[in-house]
Amino acid sequence: MIANERIKIRINQLEMMYPDSFHEMSEEKKAGLVFYKDSPGACLEDPEHHIIVTVGWTKPGIMAMMLNEKEAAKAAEKKISRPMAAHGYHLEEFSDTVLGGVKASGYRYHYHIQDTDMTGETLVVKYKKVFYYLNFYARTGLLEESFKIWHLILDTIVFEE
């Protein structure tokens, strides 16, 4: 399934581990990602399993500070749904979970790009006035195995002081 070795990464106060089959995505590949900006965080890929995971964080402005993780997830979904419509974007569901002992909200969706059916999931966590955005992208045909790997990563998340 996945390699036994795990690599630890810290993004602001979020710490997580990922399998050694992942590596930091090149700047050239990052530039091709529509919604990945130069925000602080990490952009990881596992070419063997065709998975991309991005993790970023932002300190929101005064108005956005009033949002909770569920409202921030809905705002993020609204932001991507219009431009992704050209790629057959379809929202599957909104959901809630817990990551590292902190409430998280997110959404799962499907789209089609470069002749490939894809599934994405975004999870939003608000921890100490900072929003963390965790994004997962995988080929829909490989989803069962990909979700196992994604959830192994999510299960390692802790928030440090």
What is each residue range found by the language model?
Residues 1-50, 58-67, 75-103, 110-118, ...:
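N-terminal targeting sequences that direct proteins away from the cytosol to non-cytosolic compartments
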